[in-house]
Structures are given as C-alpha cells and as structure tokens.
Amino acid sequence: MSNKQRFAVILLSLLALAPPFAIPQLSAMQEAATQQEGAEDARIHQEAVNRELEAFRAAQLSLRQAMGIAEKRHAGSRTADISFDGASGSPVYRVKTVQHNRLWEHAIDAKTGDTIGAETVSHLKDLNPDDRNNVMALRTVRQELSDAVVIAEQVASGRAIGGSLMDDNGKLNFVVVVVNGGGDLKQVVLEPPQTRGRGSNARHGSR
C-alpha cells in the first residue's frame, strides 16, 4: 500500500471515529487551508508574471524583429507562433515558422537577435490536430502574423509579447497579446481579410 493510500485510509478512519461536532470544524479548517493555498498560488503566479514583464520591457528586440530573423532562416517560411520567454538565463523569443510540411522552432535572443542553440524541425503530420489545422488554414490567407501584430499594437496601444493562430468555427484568426503602457495584458483577435479586400476585424480584451 502506498503512502498516499495509507494517508487516505487513516483520514477516513479519523472522520468515522470523530464526534459529529468535530466534522464541521475540520471542514472549516480545510476550507481555510484551501483558500490560503489559492491565495499563495495567485501571489506566486503574479510574481512570475511581473518578472516576465520586467524582462520583456528590457528586451531590445521587438516581436516583429524576432519573427523576421526566424523567417530568414528558411526563405519563404511564415511565422505560426511566437512567445516571449524571460524565465531562461537570457530572455528569448520562441518562434515557430512553417513552410510546406515542415515546422521549425527557433530561440531568438531578445537583446542581441542571435539564434540560441540549434533549431528543431518537425513534420506537419507530427502536430496535434488543432495545430495542424491552423497551419493548413494559414496557407489560405495572405495576411501574415506580423501584419496582425502591427494592427494589434495600434489597437491596444502597446507592444506585442506573443502571437498565435486560432481556429474560430472554421475560420482562422490571429491572436496577439499586447502589453500596454500601464503594464496590462490585452488580447487582440484579428480575422484575416477576405480575398475581396475587406479589412481585418479586430476585437480585444484584457487578460
């Protein structure tokens, strides 16, 4: 019997032997402990977000510049996903580019623009169904993720910290996360223009 199983059996035994008035008291203690753990988790999460934003503000390279560097590694490739990672020793942009049936993953130094480490490559068939469908849908639109970043930064009045693709009822959308001047994260969703030249429709909200 594992330690976890033993603990469960002991706890159930104590509850069975305890007088009726002791059970509500234990429940209250458990509820208080759960609330305390939740508050602690929220504090730790917020501290991690603050560190990430601080590292991002110090980055000399913009999101679009990192995308351009990654795309030049393979002529004709297009960015499908990009995120800022300030948790590593040196802050980097993690960029995924696609071309034909291949997907490359790059780490671009957020200060120097240098490529960190070796790129990894995978085949389209190796992706999960959602990611594969998004990449396939990217082939059907002319707008690039970098174009969506420009619009999102204007709409949310800030700097983009990440961008990705999202399927919305069969339609491809670009999702861009922007840090505004007040340090708030804004998510902007853009629908690529139709082939007849309709402009992008943007909607945004706080995260």
Outline where the language-model segments fall.
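Long, terminal "pre-/pro-" and other extracytoplasmic accessory regions
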Residues: 2-207
